[in-house]
């Protein structure tokens, strides 16, 4: 039995895609840029908000200065709308409660900006479920790089010895687990298809 589970957030614990897509399209509309269907945003997300901003910005608007300005704009819009449609996946709160009752330690590890990751977890889940909630930090490479995973595991005092399971919904999560030497459970209710997890 696994003693510790590291969960991805968006597409794994929470269905956040509508709020992410709507916020991005609000930014696009404000600039007169093309907007995208929600289904397309499923492949824009996963590598962090800066990469999301780069993907929805037109090629002519991707200078470092332009992307920084668009990122700040997106953060403001998303911060105001990140709870409009977001919700836990059905059965997730009950599953987490059962794991907690069984003595399984749990943490959240997301490429979502740290402040947003903490905010949505605090909004939708009991405060004592997760020992650590960690989102993307400015000085730490995002998943699937190993630095963040190793730092999180060190904080939890665990090692890649077969007792830690990583759970996520995308190829980024599969790569994250592989790079850290962890077994991975890929969920099929999230943002990607089964073939994206192999």
Could you say what each language-model-derived stretch is?
Residues 2-9, 13-94, 102, 115:
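N-terminal helical cap/lid subdomain that shapes the substrate entry/recognition surface
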Residues 6-8, 109, 167:
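Generic enzyme active-site microenvironment
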Residues 93-101, 174-178:
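Surface-exposed amphipathic alpha-helices with a cationic face
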Residues 188:
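Nucleotide-sugar donor-binding loop of glycosyltransferases
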Residues 191:
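PG/GG-rich flexible active-site loop of Rossmann-like NAD(P)H-dependent oxidoreductases
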């Amino acid at each position: 039995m696994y003693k510790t589970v590291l969960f991805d957030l968006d597409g794994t614990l929470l269905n956040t895609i509508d709020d992410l897509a709507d916020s991005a399209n609000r930014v696009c509309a404000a600039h007169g840029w093309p907007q995208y269907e929600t289904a397309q945003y499923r492949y824009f997300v996963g590598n962090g908000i800066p990469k999301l901003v780069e993907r929805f910005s037109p090629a002519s608007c991707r200078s470092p200065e332009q992307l920084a300005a668009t990122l700040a704009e997106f953060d403001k819009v998303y911060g105001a709308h990140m709870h409009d449609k977001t919700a836990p996946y059905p059965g997730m709160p009950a599953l987490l409660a059962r794991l907690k009752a069984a003595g399984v330690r749990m943490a959240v590890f997301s490429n979502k900006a740290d402040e947003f990751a903490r905010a949505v977890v605090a909004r939708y889940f009991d405060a004592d479920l997760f020992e650590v909630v960690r989102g993307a930090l400015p000085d730490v490479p995002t998943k699937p790089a190993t630095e963040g995973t190793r730092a999180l595991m060190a904080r939890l005092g665990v090692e890649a010895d077969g007792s830690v399971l990583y759970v996520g919904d995308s190829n980024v999560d599969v790569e994250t687990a592989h790079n850290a030497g962890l077994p991975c459970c890929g969920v099929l209710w999230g943002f990607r298809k089964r073939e994206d997890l192999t």
